[in-house]
A protein has these predicted regions:
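Functional cores that coordinate and move charged inorganic groups
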Residues: 144-250
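Structural signature of hydrophobic alpha-helical transmembrane segments
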Residues: 64-76, 124-138, 161, 179-192, ...
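Transmembrane alpha-helix boundary signature
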Residues: 32-45, 58-64, 78-95, 110-130, ...
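Hydrophobic core segments of alpha-helical transmembrane domains in multi-pass membrane transport
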Residues: 22-35, 75-81, 111-116, 193-198, ...
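Predominantly late transmembrane helices and immediately cytosolic-facing juxtamembrane segments
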Residues: 1-15, 49, 209-217, 221, ...
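Entry/N-cap segments of selected transmembrane alpha helices
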Residues: 86-113, 183-192, 313-337, 361, ...
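Hydrophobic transmembrane alpha-helices of secondary-active transporters
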Residues: 60, 64-89, 295-314, 329, ...
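C-terminal ends of transmembrane helices
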Residues: 4-10, 77-93, 141-152, 195-206, ...
């Protein structure tokens, strides 16, 4: 019975659609909880939790902010690892292919903001244009997981890159436009840590503990600076080394493994493990380790803590009379689509970049429709 349960659980974890299922379930639960549970939803997620280390530092945030600023760093770290892998070894290693999602992402930031401003120019809400500029990477990845292998791998790579560039741009907007105070001293520390990480990756250090410590330090520094702390995940992910296995390292790992089989003791087992770790980049190992945690825990918990929007007849009636609502709808639904799809066509027609051979404009058209899902960064801006 226990063996059967373990087998079923392992299959659930490996299934790409499991994360999307949990994400949808968490969103529904959040909506029901917020609308049927009185004020318990708001009270629970606004409960404060603090960590103190003597007089050195203290962090005091609500549970919702711990999730948005802390747990979501793991999500951005994972997608940045995937982007780095695609740029170095995957579908986007040629600049002409990588340039299309980058150009599309920039246009996807500008066009929605202009449309939103056109609806709200001259009102007190005109400065809220940042709400419509972001694509929700978590939800887009969840939707892509539902389709699984029915979508080209190249489309996923393009959309992931587009979403990451989009999110980084949106987070920079938060840092420069919507952040009241930025402390530059911690940012100097960020530059120092990033420079050290660059040197470490050049040396192909394989121990994950080094990068975990660096990531925690980056997170604290970004948090202290006033810049959104999830950027730490992006910086760390882009600085982790990725490389194809070298034949000599693979042969060495194989030799050590055979030696362990002949002499199964702790010393030979440890040597075999180290040999295998050295042959695989830290980027790929981190992706493998973090994917189930992020997809099955982090993203659903994020949705549960943020998707609880109170819906009533009165709020809907007021919303649809407001130019703010129509600016958001037009910016996200129309602006993101026009910006991303239009820029992709222009970039390819002007030969700024090119699409992968198996991708057609119909794929980009479908993918562009997904970019109008704006949730994560919009909530960060609202905060």
């Amino acid at each position: 019975m226990l063996t059967k349960f373990k087998s079923s659980f392992s299959a659930f974890v490996r299934n790409e659609t499991s994360g999307a299922t949990l994400l949808l379930a968490a969103t529904i639960v959040a909506l029901l909880w917020a609308n049927l549970g009185g004020h318990s939803y708001e009270h629970f997620w606004h409960t404060h939790f603090s960590i103190h280390l003597g007089d050195i530092f203290s962090v005091d945030m609500s549970l919702q902010h711990w999730i948005n600023d802390g747990l979501m760093m793991m999500f951005f770290f994972l997608v940045s690892l995937e982007v780095k892998h695609d740029f170095v070894m995957g579908e986007l290693r040629e600049w002409r292919r990588a340039s299309v999602p980058v150009v599309a992402a920039v246009a996807g930031l500008i066009v929605p903001a202009l449309i939103f401003y056109a609806f709200n120019a001259g009102t007190d809400d005109a400065d809220a244009w940042g709400v419509v500029i972001s694509t929700d990477t978590a939800f887009v990845m969840g939707i892509l997981a539902v389709f699984g292998n029915r979508l080209p791998v190249q489309l996923r790579a393009l959309l992931v890159t587009l979403a990451v560039v989009d999110d980084v741009g949106s987070l920079l907007v938060i840092a420069t436009v919507y952040t009241e105070r930025i402390s530059f001293v911690p940012l100097i520390g960020v530059v120092v840590i990033a420079a050290l990480l660059f040197l470490v990756q050049r040396a192909r250090v394989y121990r994950s503990s080094v990068y975990i410590a660096a990531g925690a330090t980056l997170w604290l520094l970004f948090l202290a600076s006033g810049v959104h702390a999830t950027i730490a995940g992006v910086v760390l992910g882009l600085l982790l080394p990725v490389f194809p296995p070298e034949r000599s390292e693979v042969l060495r790992a194989e030799e050590l493994t055979h030696h362990f089989r002949r002499t199964p003791v702790a010393s030979t087992g440890s040597a075999a493990v180290i040999g295998i770790l050295r042959s695989v980049s830290i980027n790929e190992r981190m992706q493998l380790a973090l994917a189930p945690i992020v997809n099955l825990i982090v993203v659903p918990v994020f949705a549960l803590s943020n998707a609880g929007v109170i819906i009533s007849g009165e709020t809907l009636q007021h919303a649809f009379k407001s130019p703010l609502t129509w600016g958001i709808i037009a910016g996200l639904v129309g602006g993101k689509y026009l910006g991303v799809f239009g820029a992709s066509i222009i970039a390819t027609k002007l030969r700024i970049g090119e699409l992968a051979q198996c991708l057609a404009y119909r794929h980009i058209n479908a993918g562009s429709m997904l970019t109008g899902i704006g949730f994560t960064i919009s909530l960060f801006i609202i905060d």
